[in-house]
């Protein structure tokens, strides 16, 4: 990568700073409003008219965050699962009976939500009915299938594919090791997990064929699909790593693309909602944009004092929000 400060195009003059005053755990957009989930208790709403609103959603730390663009689902160390809408109105959807931390959350179709605590996963439907599943070890992550009512539950030893509305036993996709975050590909044909080791693992769901994606210098903490589902963007190395998923075999037998080489590790990625553009945050606070077609780069945020901890695009792709571990945050207007 060229010197990020003065040799490449920059949009840093289009950044609206947001004073969070706390570590940023995640950022999501509800309409045109960027919502920053802070380390302790609070969601910070930064609306387009420059107004800011803080909403306390947990009595303690926010451990997990998900959004479908209409509401934000959070899990806290207070054992609660809370949904917050664009008006800042909150609703408690779940309360762990043993007051365990809520480790992961996910939003599904038709108002369905999922969360985990310890070795249990829970699904709540729109009627408020809750079902649970016991797992062999602590849950690492949750994801809803883009097609049908299936929930992938990552844990030590693999991923359990759960059908909460069916009587059939869950399916197990086994691979030794501790599986953390889990994602379905947008077409529902592949399942990918990050692992405790510096690697990704995946399965082709049609035949449970294993896919191993390695070569990282650190644990992969962030991954995202491009809008067309043909590429998986990942952090975990001193560049952006893009795995090809455009064929029926996915990345099997193929090499990844590597973009934005840098001397610091990528720690956060977010794909543009309609174009082949990826935002990448690095451990020194730098945020870059990369266009897959030709590898062109744009500087969105200069390096700072702490790693990037959150990135998100709005639905149209005209705005990019970022946050860091020390609370530096902003919204880049690309419209």
Predicted regions and their residues:
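WD40-repeat beta-propeller superdomains and closely related acidic/aromatic-rich repeat-like regions
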Residues: 1-335
């Amino acid at each position: 990568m060229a010197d990020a400060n003065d040799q490449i195009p920059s949009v840093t003059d289009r950044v609206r700073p947001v004073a969070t005053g706390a570590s940023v755990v995640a950022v999501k957009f509800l309409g045109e409003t960027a919502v920053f989930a802070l380390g302790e208790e609070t969601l910070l709403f930064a609306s387009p008219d420059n107004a800011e609103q803080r909403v306390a959603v947990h009595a303690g730390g926010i451990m997990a965050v998900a959004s479908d663009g209409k509401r934000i689902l959070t899990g806290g160390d207070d054992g609660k699962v809370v949904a917050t809408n664009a008006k800042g109105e909150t609703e408690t959807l779940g309360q762990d009976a043993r007051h365990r931390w809520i480790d992961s959350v996910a939003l599904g179709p038709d108002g369905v939500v999922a969360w985990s605590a310890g070795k249990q996963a829970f699904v709540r439907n729109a009627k408020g009915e809750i079902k649970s599943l016991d797992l062999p070890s602590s849950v690492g992550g949750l994801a809803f299938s883009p097609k049908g009512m299936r929930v992938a539950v990552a844990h030590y030893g693999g991923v359990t594919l759960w059908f909460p509305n069916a009587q059939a036993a869950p399916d197990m996709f086994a691979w030794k090791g501790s599986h953390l975050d889990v994602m379905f590909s947008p077409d529902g044909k592949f399942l990918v997990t990050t692992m405790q080791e510096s690697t990704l693992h995946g399965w082709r769901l049609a035949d449970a064929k294993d896919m191993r994606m390695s070569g990282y210098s650190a644990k992969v903490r962030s991954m995202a699909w491009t809008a067309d589902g043909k590429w998986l963007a990942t952090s975990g190395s001193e560049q952006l790593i893009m795995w090809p998923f455009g064929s029926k075999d996915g990345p099997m037998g193929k090499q990844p693309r590597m973009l934005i080489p840098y001397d610091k590790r990528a720690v956060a990625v977010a794909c543009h909602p309609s174009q082949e553009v990826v935002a990448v945050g690095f451990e020194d606070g730098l945020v870059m944009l990369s266009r897959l077609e030709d590898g062109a780069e744009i500087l969105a945020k200069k390096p700072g004092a702490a790693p990037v901890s959150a990135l998100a695009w709005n639905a149209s792709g005209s705005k990019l929000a970022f946050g860091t571990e020390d609370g530096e945050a902003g919204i880049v207007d690309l419209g």
